[in-house]
Amino acid sequence: MNQNLPFQQQQRQFLHYLRQPRVAQLPAGFAPERLSVYADLLYNKFDESLAACFPVIHRILSPTDWRILLLDFIADHRCLTPYYRQIPDEFVQYLQQERDRTNDLPFLAELAHFEWIELQLSIAESESITSKPLTREQLLSGVPVFASVMQLLHYQWPVQDIGPHALPAEPPATTGNCQNNCRLNS
């Protein structure tokens, strides 16, 4: 009972073409122009979402390198979630665990993780710790309270400083002072 029905075979060919339109064989029964529209829609939707979630990566990569990265992600990664809003998390997992990093910027996976956590924390719901500013006396006599939404992260690369004009070629030497710790909170 493990046979593929003809429509299932056609669906698999269609999906294979959408994932790899440059190399996949055109499925029978489809007009090339129509398939091209679907492939472009898929790429554009991923581009729109991931460029918004990873703005630094989008800015530091050339348009060609960004396009190659997204096309590789679409072709190679099998998302485990049907939810569109979780695609950026899948993208980070792809960069960390699946992608051949030989030709990538050496800090790409760490930067993607940093940008994704930063975005998640910025939109996370949290209760205000105080409704009014504290006086100096209250600050000194009170018990410190951490923000309810916070992450302490450590990276090999100074991801919080990376941008179009700050692209390190080597990770900084560690001096024992944990200089690449990042505290993120909303």
Predicted regions and their residues:
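Hydrophobic packing positions characteristic
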Residues: 75-186
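N-terminal, charged low-complexity regulatory/assembly segments
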Residues: 1-125
